Amino acid sequence: VTMSRGKPLPVGPTARLKDGMSWEKLSTMTPEDIKEKNVFPYLPLPHPNHATGGMLFSQIQVEKFPRLKRFDLDFDIPEYFLPEFPPAIFLTTHKDKGDVSQGKVVTLENYYELFNGLLNPKQLEGLRLLVTQFPQQQFNATADRKSEKPSQGVTCFDCHLNGHTSAATHLVGDIRPQSHRNRLDTPTLRGVNIQRLFGSQRALKSIEDFTEFEQRAAYFDGDILTAIKKGTNILERGSQVHFMAEFQSLLDFPPAPKLDIFGRLDTKKATDSEIRGQAIFFSKGKCFKCHPAPYYTDNLMHDLQVERFYKPQVINGQYIRAEGPIKTFPLRGIKDSPPYLHDGRLLTLEDTVEFFNLVLETNLNVEEKNDLVAFLRQL
């Protein structure tokens, strides 16, 4: 199994367990025991420099676009655990064409060539704005920046590469003090047309809201005065935000040839392991309680209370503590968007299954976990 354009899937689990621990032993321990013995393997992931934070792009993207290079930091997750570069683009209006990216990164220089004839003029204008640079906290023309040279800024599609994700990281803008801010793993925009909440914790109610407010404040760590100094991009709701949102709403999930129209496996196409994994997903694994078919999201927020498993502490500048409710992200196409969880701490689907096996206390055995991963790869 590969990602949509052929990149091999990373395989785990990758977490290093404490001496004397095994996944089987951990799954039999209570949250209190795991917390007391300090053996939880999936603590929140800090920013590479948590005290400074800010947008940070992968090495493969920086090599392609040197304007995104920071002089103070390099990305911390190996390319093997990141989405393919560049990712495919699927449109709800052109399902017959499959990937319309032509294997290219969509930019201001090529967007018209790639999409003229596929989009109407309004959608083309929305896409143009999505690939246009605007000032941002770390990338701007003032002396207060993290790029060597003055910068015109970043584009929406620098993080949401080709309407998917580059796995760029940042710190959420809505928490203070700095040490309490959570790391953010850029989510895909595929399938935003079926989503009703936006932002991992802020619960914005429309893609229009998110598109407009992201550049007014989140681009600048939620600091409105800094935004004014560096160049806030005030988008007009009717003739800019609407156009950008309309294009984003065309971004489709990747094909899932083994799923039927209800989002379940077609038993004539699926393997025995995948069928067993689906049964676990909708029963013992408890996955379906938050991730129902066909898109595998309930469009709600849930508090997993992961703090049951660790003591509050400072790790690499981040004060880890109770994180509160997090948006339920769709699992359709999940194999294309590692790493996982809101901060990217889970590098593979195997890590994700191990994490939830502990957090949900489902006590799955080795075969059940392998089958569940096999099912997730087909979504």
Task: List PLM regions with ranges.
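Periplasmic c-type cytochrome electron-transfer domains
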Residues: 1-379
